[in-house]
Amino acid sequence: MTNIRKTHPLMKILNNAFIDLPTPSNISSWWNFGSLLGLCLIMQILTGLFLAMHYTPDTSTAFSSVAHICRDVNYGWIIRYLHANGASMFFICLYTHIGRSLYYGSHTSQETWNIGVLLLLMVMATAFVGYVLPWGQMSFWGATVITNLLSAIPYIGNTLVEWIWGGFSVDKATLTRFFTFHFILPFIITALVAVHLLFLHETGSNNPTGIPSNMDTIPFHPYYTIKDILGALLLILTLLTVTLFTPDLLGDPDNYTPANPLNTPAHIKPEWYFLFAYTILRSIPNKLGGVLALLLSILILLFIPMLQTSKQRSMMFRPLSQLLFWTLIADFLILTWIGGQPVEHPYITVGQLASILYFLLILVLMPVASLIENKLLKW
């Protein structure tokens, strides 16, 4: 008798995606982050759903409703902090996933890569509107500052900002629509994840060598299901440790003060996962220039497949490119650090140099290094 998982229309799809999927036999733990991102998404949707049952998207009660969740709702505090720190874990996995794809040349699968970049943008949008919901000081001023950047667009800027706000300032209408977006976006992300996987399974997974592995594959289950479960356990352990011991480690103390339009916090800054882009924005003294650089700092990922000049897919056997890749990672960390510092000397200069290096590495140095490596290998 034929196995039901191979004949049933629905089971067949799941079987071909998670059970009998031919997978390269040599993929390392860096390939775990895709499944971890799926786990993060599920956790965020579930915790978010329970939070939405008790949250009220109204300027007069939003802050109190979050306090009510933490104080009065059964296990509300852990749901709230799992959701807040879950977002941080989500971005750690996202950035690692992107870094792995860059290192091993996964961006040569262009459709998968482009949908991945779109997913990154949507997760960033979701995190931004979500940060506004507790209606603390940093929520309010973060929303004001970031939405205000759109006013740099010539001709339509101011109208666009007022349209997004639903008035002449960040107020009740803004909070309501941000809650709506925060609720709907994760479901759109889930649909895009399915498309991301669809395109990935068209070509099959890449592997550390970057060489086609069609002749050396093993079934996904049980080998990689076990490996993914180990990764999932480590992720959950880390998340629970942070949530139970230092829940506010990655948050901002200013957000425990209710939003006050008459009092600006000393240092307005976003959550840690946006700090690298925030530094690039601050590094340019011109408003429109800063906004364009901010956009380009993320959209530059779309140009990476076009900048692939190496004849080898992976960086595994390319020491020069490896050096530049790790320089890029260090630069990303420096940008993140600078974003959390006040706008004063020497942070301004360091931020500007790190911003220049960021674009220089991706657009010039890495493609040139690849060409040099081609020459050295007489390719």
From Swiss-Prot:
Lineage top rank: taxon: Eukaryota
Protein name per Swiss-Prot or TrEMBL: Cytochrome b
Cofactor: heme b
Note: Heme 1 (or BL or b562) is low-potential and absorbs at about 562 nm, and heme 2 (or BH or b566) is high-potential and absorbs at about 566 nm.
Gene Ontology annotations of biological process type: mitochondrial electron transport, ubiquinol to cytochrome c
CDD domains: cytochrome_b_C (cd00290), Cytochrome_b_N (cd00284)
General function of this protein: Component of the ubiquinol-cytochrome c reductase complex (complex III or cytochrome b-c1 complex) that is part of the mitochondrial respiratory chain. The b-c1 complex mediates electron transfer from ubiquinol to cytochrome c. Contributes to the generation of a proton gradient across the mitochondrial membrane that is then used for ATP synthesis.
GO function term, MF aspect, one: ubiquinol-cytochrome-c reductase activity
Binding site for heme b b566: H97, H196
Keyword field: Electron transport, Heme, Iron, Membrane, Metal-binding, Mitochondrion, Mitochondrion inner membrane, Respiratory chain, Transmembrane, Transmembrane helix, Transport, Ubiquinone
InterPro entries: Cyt_b/b6_C (IPR005798), Cyt_b/b6_C_sf (IPR036150), Cyt_b/b6_N (IPR005797), Cytb/b6-like_sf (IPR027387), Cytochrome_b (IPR030689), Cytochrome_b_C_euk/bac (IPR048260), Cytochrome_b_N_euk/bac (IPR048259), Di-haem_cyt_TM (IPR016174)
Principal cellular location given in the protein's record: mitochondrion
Oligomer and partners: The cytochrome bc1 complex contains 11 subunits: 3 respiratory subunits (MT-CYB, CYC1 and UQCRFS1), 2 core proteins (UQCRC1 and UQCRC2) and 6 low-molecular weight proteins (UQCRH/QCR6, UQCRB/QCR7, UQCRQ/QCR8, UQCR10/QCR9, UQCR11/QCR10 and a cleavage product of UQCRFS1). This cytochrome bc1 complex then forms a dimer.
Transmembrane region(s): 33-53, 77-98, 113-133, 178-198, 226-246, 288-308, 320-340, 347-367
Pfam families found in the cross-reference section: Cytochrom_B_C, Cytochrome_B
Binding site for a ubiquinone: H201
GO cellular component terms, A-Z: mitochondrial inner membrane; respiratory chain complex III
Family: Belongs to the cytochrome b family.
